[in-house]
From Swiss-Prot:
One of its GO terms (molecular function) is metal ion binding. GO terms for cellular component: cytoplasm. Residues 6-128 form the RNase III domain. Belongs to the ribonuclease III family. It comes from Buchnera aphidicola subsp. Baizongia pistaciae (strain Bp). Mg(2+) binds at residues 41, 114, 117. It catalyses: Endonucleolytic cleavage to 5'-phosphomonoester. The lineage of its organism: Bacteria, Pseudomonadati, Pseudomonadota, Gammaproteobacteria, Enterobacterales. Digests double-stranded RNA. Involved in the processing of primary rRNA transcript to yield the immediate precursors to the large and small rRNAs (23S and 16S). Processes some mRNAs, and tRNAs when they are encoded in the rRNA operon. Processes pre-crRNA and tracrRNA of type II CRISPR loci if present in the organism. The keyword tRNA processing applies. It is found in: Cytoplasm. This is Ribonuclease 3. The gene is rnc.
Length: 226
């Protein structure tokens, strides 16, 4: 990745890295290099959850724990992170292996969402908690303003199930197509099958739950609900 490309992405993110190798690693998928972004993703996931929880606690002093948990889940879920990635054009900067490139990995929601988390982890390591907190709140400014405690925050599987029930259609089936990697570092590929949709929708994630949620989200998109 050349200097011009790095500069362009840093401008989009609103942060200039001291250690450019952390930025490169955050953008590197496991299919491209053994020095990939999954550990950074793990770190970024925890930091994001803390920052959003802290913001909700102070922005909504009269909202109960259950509603705040649902609000946080909506703000940190893969679909929201993928939207942020699209806003940043992150797909243009991903380092992917040939297989992922050919299968359209640069557009895959799970890969994009994981990369946002990895970037959060890398910026934290390159700076400090205060810096990454300020940056996350900047990225989430409009979303934090728009989220409403009175809205029922439901995950994609729940929304899909309720939609199908409202149409008196059979509930979806989630089928494990592939499990890749060691027991402590697995990647799940899951298909969601729904009566009335000819094509299965796919979800890929670091856990079965995450993969099922992505498959359900893609089904909602295919049905034209979202």
């Amino acid at each position: 990745m050349n200097h011009t490309v790095i500069q362009k992405l840093q401008k989009i993110l609103g942060y200039t890295f001291i250690k450019k190798d952390l930025l490169i690693q955050a953008l590197t998928h496991r299919s491209a290099n053994s020095k990939h972004n999954e550990r950074l993703e793990f770190l970024g996931d925890s930091i994001l959850s803390f920052v959003i929880a802290n913001a909700l606690y102070h922005c909504f002093p009269h909202v109960n724990e259950g509603d705040m948990s649902r609000m946080r889940a909506t703000l940190v879920r893969g679909h929201t992170l993928a939207k942020i990635a699209y806003e940043f054009d992150l797909g243009d900067y991903l380092q992917l292996g040939q297989g992922e490139l050919k299968s359209g990995g640069f557009r895959r929601e799970s890969i994009l969402a994981n990369t946002v988390e990895a970037l959060i982890g890398s910026i934290f390591l390159d700076s400090n908690l205060k810096t990454i907190e300020k940056l996350i709140l900047k990225w989430y400014k409009n979303r934090l303003k728009a989220i409403n405690p009175s809205d029922t925050q439901k995950d994609p599987k729940t929304r899909l199930q309720e939609y199908l029930q409202s149409k008196h259609l059979p509930l979806p089936s989630y089928l494990v197509e592939q499990v890749y990697g060691e027991a402590h570092n697995q990647l799940f590929t899951i298909y969601c099958e729904i009566s009335g949709i000819n094509e299965k929708t796919i979800g890929i994630g670091s856990s079965r739950r995450k993969a099922e949620q992505e498959a359900a989200q893609n089904a909602l998109i295919k049905l034209g609900i979202e």
